[in-house]
């Protein structure tokens, strides 16, 4: 499993990254305004070189389907922490109290919640000091061509599971890296340090550090990691307290998987011919760049604002799509509620591409996302203020939020209405002509 320190191949890759400054010599930080598109020939590689050519799947699209996944992992659930009736508190509060070192019979203790298989992160009460260990792991395959941005996206995706719990600090990260055996030695030496640097830069932006990991050789490139934090109960928000009347807020647009696939189709005439009537090459390039920037943006700001605006529950939107993750979150609720989604903020033109291609299921909410936004249950009176606050320049550029649905009385399910309102989200650098007439109202109430 994970090495204790940055040694071996992982250490060599990180050491090589020390001398690398990212694409075009830039350190992007919280702004992508100075980003220049990746050109493989700048590294001495062929102009036709593609990072995505070293895997057969892309990003979070590699996930095992949710229902099958839960069956596969059923044997890992410990008898003393099995989820009762699909609730979010694992094993009951008394068992959680005993795990935390309290005497048997001490009674329910909301101070020591626990969370296991089925949600974004595990929450394990520690034996000492009323603290909890919150930990998550994630990895996937390349879905963009820029190695540096791929590293940033992978790190942002790992940290996002902590941010979905309202956690803003991470104590430590490990990096998991697989170098493709199909790569030449020259390709490995030039590309791998950029991926490592992107991962490390995103970790540093998140206020943490990569202290070790594991690196192997594999047919496909893989990158991801482990994020760990020890915190007090008031530092995280359990994903189980939505109430009737809450609204659902989404902090990144959908359509990332569609955008990265459409970008690859520019070099595939058979696929491109199916969608070229609904989107131009320029629009695909802009959508791809916007998807890349969004995936590389940390959800840390949204996590902090969850506390400010009294969030009741949240999850991040990744491989199961907005519908799958909404359904999973709904199952965790203590109250008898259901989620109804009315609005779908989507990167401009990607809804049309999804429909024309006959793939993805973007409008049905089943299209995979990678390093997507947080879906947050907020009190109705707080939601519009959240959407306004997150766009403040003090948090840097690129943060957005939309009210996309409501929480109503129900049986812990989630659904998207038959004809959801599509909000076309204008990519940075696009002309106003791409913008749909109603897409500027970021905090509009869902319609029935």
Swiss-Prot record:
UniProt PTM = Truncated SEPHS2 proteins produced by failed UGA/Sec decoding are ubiquitinated by the CRL2(KLHDC3) complex, which recognizes the glycine (Gly) at the C-terminus of truncated SEPHS2 proteins.
Q: Where is the active site?
A: 60
Q: Where is this site: Important for catalytic activity?
A: 63
Q: Which reaction does it catalyse?
A: hydrogenselenide + ATP + H2O = selenophosphate + AMP + phosphate + 2 H(+)
Q: A GO molecular-function term, please? A: selenide, water dikinase activity
Query: Has the keyword Nucleotide-binding been applied to this entry?
Result: yes
Give the cofactor note text.
Answer: Binds 1 Mg(2+) ion per monomer.
What Gene Ontology cellular-component terms does the record carry?
Answer: cytoplasm; cytosol
User: Which terms under GO biological process does the entry name?
Assistant: selenium compound metabolic process; selenocysteine biosynthetic process; selenocysteine metabolic process
- Phosphoserine modification sites? 46, 97
The residues the record assigns to binding ATP are 63, 118-120, 138, 161, 212-215
Stretch list, region Disordered: 85-107
Q: Its domain of life? A: Eukaryota
Q: Which UniProt keywords apply?
A: Acetylation, ATP-binding, Kinase, Magnesium, Metal-binding, Nucleotide-binding, Phosphoprotein, Selenium, Selenocysteine, Transferase, Ubl conjugation
Q: Known EC number(s)?
A: 2.7.9.3
What cofactor does this protein call for?
Answer: Mg(2+)
Functional note: Synthesizes selenophosphate from selenide and ATP.
Q: How does it assemble?
A: Homodimer.
The family note in this entry says: Belongs to the selenophosphate synthase 1 family. Class I subfamily.
Which PANTHER family does its entry note?
Answer: SELENIDE, WATER DIKINASE, SELENIDE, WATER DIKINASE 2
Put simply, this protein is called Selenide, water dikinase 2
